[in-house]
Amino acid sequence: MQIIIRKFLWYKFLNSLFLGLSIGSIFTLYTPLNPSIYSMGGVFLALGMLFIAKQYSKILNINAFYKISLLVEFTLLFGILYFLLFYYSYATALIVYVGYQVTFVFGSYLVRAETLFLKYKKAIELVDVAKQKGYLLGMLLSYGFYQIIEYLLGVKDNQIQVYWIHYLLLVSQMSIIVMLIASFRRRK
């Protein structure tokens, strides 16, 4: 497999746009969770990252990078769909939190693998610039979205606002998956 850099840049842009869009919703989503959950989540996150780091000799290849990237993106898609279907509850907050923790377990691996497979300084620079542009745009869109639904549509309830932004997150996440798949090509 090989990375198609132009499409990969769009994937990274959209991925960071999602992060910018979603960042404010986490605080409302996680409201039902007990603070001790975050402590245990941190312990499991550290253990998971340790386990992944010990697997580098097996998974630091482009095929594993592609599959793990897909796993992360589909995990996020599942969390969004679950929230949209089952709304707010302790179980929903916990499932979404665990989903995010699962994706974070692979964070260091994905950054290291991405750096290895991009190879060139210019490609790495372009990816980082695309990520920052996506993140900034996502935060601006998120801010605008919340302002519009609060002041133009009169929706003042934070839970309803966060529920609505999840439809944008759903479209964003589906676009991310499509672009991720398009970013890789099998070598002939």
Protein language model regions, located:
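Cytoplasmic membrane-interface "Motif A"-like loop-to-helix N-cap segments
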Residues: K58-V72
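A membrane-interface helix-boundary motif in multi-pass transporters
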Residues: Y143, Q147-M174
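Substrate-agnostic recognition of the 12-TM MFS/MFS-like secondary transporter fold
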Residues: F8-G20, G24, T28, G99-Y146
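Alpha-helical transmembrane segments of MFS and MFS-like solute carriers/permeases
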Residues: I3-F18, G41, T92-G99, L168
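Multi-pass alpha-helical transporter architecture, strongest
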Residues: L169-K188
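Central cavity-lining transmembrane alpha-helices of secondary-active solute carriers
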Residues: M40-S57
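Membrane-helix interface and helix-disruption motif detector
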Residues: Y30-G41, Y87-V96
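C-terminal ends and interior cores of transmembrane alpha-helices
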Residues: E73-L94
